[in-house]
């Protein structure tokens, strides 16, 4: 809460049963060019994840976006005090964690705590009872109903829930007086920090979904844990929308690369190449991803731990495909409803007030 109190930019809080991460990433993608912003990593929206996210703020961003997730009454009170959002975006309402609430209305009441001090509110009236409750409770603040905004054509975004998410992003941009978003397609959220076997006995860490300083720091830390005794290669693209001058930006990047023990850098893009002198490790640079695929030095691959970290425009998925070891597809189906049932069964056997800690084993997340 203290760290948040020092921040002078605009803070956005996103809550709802589903769609928080998708809408957060979509909003970040549609922000005005050149704006320095921060968004919480992955799905850091819990009682632990939110404080960690706030502590990652550098302090000079214009906009910060956080998710807030709850599983029982009382949790949003704490999250609201930490985030203190100026703008709140409500996504959908559903049955997630319903076992800890008397009814859906109680859950909506809990979620609306996040907006008690917000000056701007965005919601979608399709999602009842949340929509009606938000409209009534915050009528004096004239909340933005996303249902009033044009629906993206089905030919562009086929999924109805994704089209409603797009309307929420439209409403947010209108509330903030940003240019209207230009939707090309629905955003996809592939598994970040995906580890695969690479060619030439390498390990490939694919985190090519987005790129900013915060996510780069997290990815480099992950590389350190995966690499063990292997030498480390970073494949990095130009970074856009940092809000920093190129000299300051790539100076920071060079420091992060050095501290992470990266000994080979492959830079893609003209801005990185112009700042090649900042990097003390072995390095090579390419104008485009396609050129890199065609000319990459095999020394940078064989037996190494390779981190792919690129902005979406650079299409690093093509590079990941080129460097990945070919294998047959294996499908693992996980029944989350069954997992929830099992967790609640064992919770019912515990004494009242006993807390649970869930651990996801190794790199399975």
Predicted regions mapped to residue ranges:
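Acidic, Mg2+-coordinating active-site environments of NTP-dependent enzymes
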Residues: 86-203, 229-230, 255-264, 270-283
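A charged N-terminal "starter" segment
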Residues: 304, 315-365
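Nucleotide phosphate-binding/pyrophosphate-handling subdomain across enzymes
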Residues: 78, 155-260, 340-357, 363
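Residue-level signal for inorganic ion chemistry
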Residues: 14, 50, 67, 79, ...
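Active-site beta-loop-alpha junctions enriched in small/polar residues
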Residues: 17-19, 69, 126, 209, ...
